[in-house]
């Protein structure tokens, strides 16, 4: 399928909208009313610090809603106002934030159901309005919705679209796309649908494994079993890893994406020599600015003398879990929560989710005496949620 030609055709359809309905000023005002916090604004204006009694708060200097998320959420709300009586569907969570998605449900936006990873579009009819979330949608989903005669509201983050352009470039020049991401993540599913041959690698360990295979040090059956579900149909590692380009899920750890790019550049340099490198490796630049800023701010935050650190964001939010990884790697006692309700003021407890683990209840999580708490949040977390967490910490330390 010529995905570029399809996208061009879709963009010229009178049933496709990727700009929204409100002016930038009205959009900003609506978001400010819904999600901004005077407390957070005050803390930002005070060098990201706050003190109340024995509680000392240090906020990361970049956290919370990014531009792409703000745009997607605003467009989703605008869509209901613009189509007050129509059936409105969304193909997935608009962003990985439970409060925002719950608000859409209260606005009678229906979420496409899925079973075993297969979405059921049977209830979507001609003339219905369908929102594509910030992560994007697969090209097959877009084609299906277009053929059904739906009004498509595309809130895909422009940084995600940039990655799609990258893998389409790989396809045009017959390169296999190596995508740094989680193969079941909505964004990676969308990105891979625009590729021809692709392989998804989760981390540096998997990238090094692929590198060894390219250099002739691996077993094909083991390779195929290890990456089952993470490569394109008909993928043959003996043929499809001679020419590779790297792309990424925009919310992955920036430093690891860069390392993975270096791994494959060095691998192709070793196998084919400098004179043929450009024929076998395509450089990339698909790291999202907002992801980079939040991770850099987190690296600065963990250098502070913190007693504990609270990371706020959806449990299925990739960018949030990577922020937590940074804290863990610095051996800081950190707690990942998705909503302020995970904190009990009465019990001085926090119900949190450690990495790759089930929920854990930590009692007496705020110790006696002076305490310095670091706080950050993922790109899908509104300021009001962060403020509500801080208010609970204030109440505990009174």
UniProtKB/Swiss-Prot annotation:
Q: Which residues bind [4Fe-4S] cluster?
A: 66, 157, 288
Where dimethylallyl diphosphate binds, per the record, is at: 96, 185, 317-319, 380
Q: What is its EC number?
A: 1.17.7.4
Which GO BP terms sit in this record? dimethylallyl diphosphate biosynthetic process; isopentenyl diphosphate biosynthetic process, methylerythritol 4-phosphate pathway; terpenoid biosynthetic process
Cofactor(s) of this protein: [4Fe-4S] cluster
Which keywords describe this protein according to UniProt? 4Fe-4S, Iron, Iron-sulfur, Isoprene biosynthesis, Metal-binding, Oxidoreductase
Q: Name one GO molecular function term.
A: 4-hydroxy-3-methylbut-2-enyl diphosphate reductase activity
Q: Does the keyword Acyltransferase apply?
A: no
Q: Where (2E)-4-hydroxy-3-methylbut-2-enyl diphosphate is bound, by residue?
A: 96, 185, 250, 317-319, 380
Keyword Oxidoreductase in record? yes
What is catalyzed by this enzyme? isopentenyl diphosphate + 2 oxidized [2Fe-2S]-[ferredoxin] + H2O = (2E)-4-hydroxy-3-methylbut-2-enyl diphosphate + 2 reduced [2Fe-2S]-[ferredoxin] + 2 H(+); dimethylallyl diphosphate + 2 oxidized [2Fe-2S]-[ferredoxin] + H2O = (2E)-4-hydroxy-3-methylbut-2-enyl diphosphate + 2 reduced [2Fe-2S]-[ferredoxin] + 2 H(+)
Catalytic-site annotation from UniProt: 187 (proton donor)
Chain positions recorded as isopentenyl diphosphate binding sites: 96, 185, 317-319, 380
Cofactor binding description: Binds 1 [4Fe-4S] cluster per subunit.
Give the record's pathway: Isoprenoid biosynthesis; dimethylallyl diphosphate biosynthesis; dimethylallyl diphosphate from (2E)-4-hydroxy-3-methylbutenyl diphosphate: step 1/1; Isoprenoid biosynthesis; isopentenyl diphosphate biosynthesis via DXP pathway; isopentenyl diphosphate from 1-deoxy-D-xylulose 5-phosphate: step 6/6
Write down the HAMAP family for this protein, in alphabetical order: IspH
Q: Which family does it belong to?
A: Belongs to the IspH family.
This chain's function reads: Catalyzes the conversion of 1-hydroxy-2-methyl-2-(E)-butenyl 4-diphosphate (HMBPP) into a mixture of isopentenyl diphosphate (IPP) and dimethylallyl diphosphate (DMAPP). Acts in the terminal step of the DOXP/MEP pathway for isoprenoid precursor biosynthesis.
Protein known as: 4-hydroxy-3-methylbut-2-enyl diphosphate reductase
Q: Which organism is it from?
A: Prochlorococcus marinus subsp. pastoris (strain CCMP1986 / NIES-2087 / MED4)
Lineage at the top is:
Bacteria, Bacillati, Cyanobacteriota, Cyanophyceae, Synechococcales
Q: Which gene encodes it?
A: ispH
């Amino acid at each position: 399928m010529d995905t570029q030609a399809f996208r061009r055709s879709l963009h010229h359809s009178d049933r496709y909208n990727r700009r929204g309905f409100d002016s930038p000023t009205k959009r900003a005002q609506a978001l400010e009313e819904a999600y901004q916090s005077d407390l957070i604004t005050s803390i930002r204006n005070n060098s990201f610090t706050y003190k109340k009694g024995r509680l000392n708060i240090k906020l990361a200097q970049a956290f919370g809603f990014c531009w792409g998320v703000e745009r997607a959420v605003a467009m989703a709300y605008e869509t209901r106002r613009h189509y007050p009586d129509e059936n409105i569907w969304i193909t997935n969570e608009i962003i990985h934030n439970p409060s925002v998605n719950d608000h859409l449900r209260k606005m009678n936006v229906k979420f496409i159901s899925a079973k075993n990873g297969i979405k059921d579009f049977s209830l979507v009819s001609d003339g219905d309005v369908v929102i594509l979330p910030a992560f994007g949608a697969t090209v097959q989903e877009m084609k299906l919705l277009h053929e059904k005669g739906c009004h498509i509201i595309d809130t895909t983050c422009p940084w995600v679209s940039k990655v799609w352009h990258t893998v389409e470039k790989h396809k045009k020049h017959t390169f296999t796309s190596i995508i740094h991401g989680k193969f079941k993540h909505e964004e990676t599913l969308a990105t891979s649908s625009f590729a021809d041959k692709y392989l998804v690698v989760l981390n540096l360990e998997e990238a090094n494994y692929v590198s060894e295979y390219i250099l002739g040090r691996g077993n094909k059956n083991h390779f195929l079993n290890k990456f089952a579900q993470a490569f394109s149909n008909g993928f043959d590692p003996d043929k499809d890893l001679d020419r590779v380009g790297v792309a990424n899920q925009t919310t992955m750890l920036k430093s690891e994406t860069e390392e993975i790019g270096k791994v494959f550049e060095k691998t192709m340099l070793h196998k084919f020599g400098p004179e043929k490198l450009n024929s076998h490796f395509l450089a990339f630049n698909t790291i999202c600015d907002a992801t980079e800023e939040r991770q850099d701010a987190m690296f600065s935050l963990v250098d502070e003398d913190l007693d504990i650190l609270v990371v706020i964001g959806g449990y299925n939010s990739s960018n949030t879990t990577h922020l937590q990884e940074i804290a863990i790697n610095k051996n800081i006692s950190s707690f990942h929560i998705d909503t302020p309700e995970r904190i009990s003021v009465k019990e001085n407890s926090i119900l949190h989710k450690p990495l790759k683990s089930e929920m854990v209840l930590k009692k007496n999580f705020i110790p006696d005496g002076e305490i310095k708490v670091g706080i950050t949040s993922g790109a899908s977390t509104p300021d009001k949620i962060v403020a509500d967490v801080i208010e609970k910490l204030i109440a505990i330390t009174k």
